[in-house]
Design a protein with these regions (language model features):
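Outer-membrane beta-barrel porins/channels
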Residues: 3-24, 28, 32, 50, ...
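N-terminal periplasmic accessory domains that precede
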Residues: 35-47
């Protein structure tokens, strides 16, 4: 999409959580003791145990590495404080001149250092905020920005409904690569999850990029479903309609995305490693 190509720091759109990645790449409503989920919604930090360390790694594409780390601290019964880092290293790339002749190589990387705070506002309702400092290096060029994520989560434990609203990457650049300041990858999301009492199944639906009114409605939608084999083991999959649409080759009735948009995963939570 043109809007994404015109924004900076698009690594912030990538899921830190392997769980969220398995469910279509976007999920802001899962209530679990998983610190990586609070990168998607700061209100979910309240579900993370005290003194929890989180680490994640993804080989995003050839030569590119994406990593996340966090530490969570409970502040009494209602508040939670966490610190986190998101880091993307794009590796070494060719540097060419105007005639496409290679004249050398350069490295590119981006990092966001974050502080996360969540607080129980009312019964079943939690609010959260993430403050982040972002810096990017492309060869000899550097830019910096500040941003904020705002999140709300309402969770009804008896019926296992979870509903969230998140506004991500509100802010702007404080230092541009050159003279022109870039735009932040602002994203407003709404999501819902439901766990069924009679079946060990949880389903999720998340609407993303709601500030982009020119998208077809279906391209805002991410769907996910999980089978909860136990309190510690899940197997799930998801479908990202927008990704499937963008990866479709051709515009005929027989055009195919060749499986793009589908995602799958599984997870196990080992108590002794918490």
């Amino acid at each position: 999409r043109a809007q994404e190509s015109q924004t900076e720091y698009n690594f912030l759109r990538l899921p830190v959580s392997a769980h969220a990645a398995a469910l279509g790449g976007e999920n802001i409503t899962i209530i679990e003791d998983d610190p990586s989920l609070m990168f998607s919604n700061p209100a979910l930090a309240s579900s993370v145990s005290d003194k929890t360390v989180g680490l994640s790694y993804m080989n995003y594409m050839r030569g590119a590495h994406y990593m996340g780390a966090s530490y969570t601290k409970a502040l009494g019964e209602k508040a939670t404080l966490a610190g986190g880092v998101q880091y993307m290293n794009y590796g070494k790339m060719k540097e060419v001149d105007a005639n496409n002749v290679q004249i050398g190589t350069f490295n590119a990387s981006e990092i966001a250092v974050e502080g996360i705070f969540s607080y129980e506002l009312a019964r079943n309702l939690v609010g959260g905020i993430t403050a982040k400092f972002i810096t990017s290096y492309i060869g000899n060029y550097n830019s910096m920005a500040v941003g904020v994520d705002l999140g709300l989560n309402w969770f009804e434990p008896e019926r296992q409904w979870s509903v969230s609203l998140v506004a991500k990457n509100l802010g702007g650049q404080i230092k541009a690569y050159e003279e022109e300041y870039g735009k932040m990858p602002i994203d407003v999301q709404v999501g819902v999850s439901k766990t069924f009492a009679a079946l060990p199944v949880r389903v999720s639906a998340t609407l993303v990029d709601l500030t982009h009114y020119d998208y077809r409605f279906i391209n805002h939608l991410n769907l996910g479903a999980e089978v909860l084999l136990s309190e510690s083991i899940w197997v799930g999959g998801g479908y990202n309609f927008r990704k499937a649409d963008e990866m479709t080759i051709g515009k005929t009735e027989n055009a195919s995305a060749h499986g793009a948009g589908f995602s799958f995963g599984a997870g196990i939570n080992l108590e002794q490693f918490k």
